[in-house]
C-alpha cells in the first residue's frame, strides 16, 4: 500500500512542510448528519424515494447509536503503519454486535413487512453466525451474505470502524503512486470519489465504504488499475453532471466521481445511491463497478 499512517516521531519530522493530506479522516457525528439530510433531500420526487428514506433511517440510527454507545478507547498501539485497521486482519471488538442490536431496535418501529422479517432473522441469529457473516463481508465475499442482511451488518461494522479510525494517528504521507484502489486505513473498497473545494480545491479523494476515510488519488488515473489510458467520463445529464462515471477501457471498470464545486452538499454514499440509474447505464455498456455502496450489495449466490 502506498499511503502510510505516520507515528508521532514521524509527524514531527514533517511538521514544517505543508502538503495536501494524503488521508482525510471523517468527523463521525457531522458525517452522519450530512448523509441523512442529503438522503432525505435526494428522496424528494425520486423514483426510489422509499429506499433512500430507508437508508436515511439507517444513517440516523447509526448517529443515535454513536451518541448513546460510543466506542471505548481501544488497544491500538502495535498496529501496522500500512492499513492499520485492515478489515480482514484487524481484531475487532464484539461491541459491533451491540451496535447491530441498537440499529435494529431503531429501525424496527418503521419497518415494512420485508424489512421486519430481516430484522427478526438477525435478532435470532447467534453471535457466532453474525461473526461469520461479518467475516465474509469484510473479506469482500459479498455474494455469500444476502443483501438484505448485509446492509444492517455493514452499518454496524462501519460504525465501529469509523470510531476506531478516530483513535489512530491522523497524519499520513504517500509512499508511492501504486495500489491506491483500496483504503489505506482499513483496506476496504471506495464508494466513489469526490473532487474537493476549499483548501483541497481540485484534488480527488476516494471515500471508503467501511471506515469512511478519504484518500487522495490524482485525477486522470484509473481508480482500479492505475492506468492513464482509455479513460472516459459519462453522465446521464451533461448539463447537470454533478455525478459522473469514470470508465477505464484497460480493466473495463468504473467508479463514480462527484464535484463539490457543482454542489457543496454532495455526499458520496447518498449521491452514489441516488444515481443508481447511471450504474445501470454503465453495466449495459459492459463496465463493472470497482467500488461498493453500503446500501447496494450484490445478490447472494444461490
Curated annotation (Swiss-Prot):
One of its GO terms (biological process) is protein maturation. InterPro entries: FdhE-like_sf, FdhE_C, FdhE_central, FdhE_N, Formate_DH_accessory. The keyword Transmembrane does not apply. GO terms for cellular component: cytosol. SUPFAM superfamilies: FdhE-like. Keywords: Cytoplasm. GO terms for molecular function: ferric iron binding. The keyword Cytoplasm applies. Its main location: cytoplasm. Pfam families: FdhE_C (PF24860), FdhE_central (PF24859), FdhE_N (PF04216). Necessary for formate dehydrogenase activity. This is Protein FdhE homolog. It comes from Haemophilus influenzae (strain PittEE). The lineage of its organism: Bacteria, Pseudomonadati, Pseudomonadota, Gammaproteobacteria, Pasteurellales.
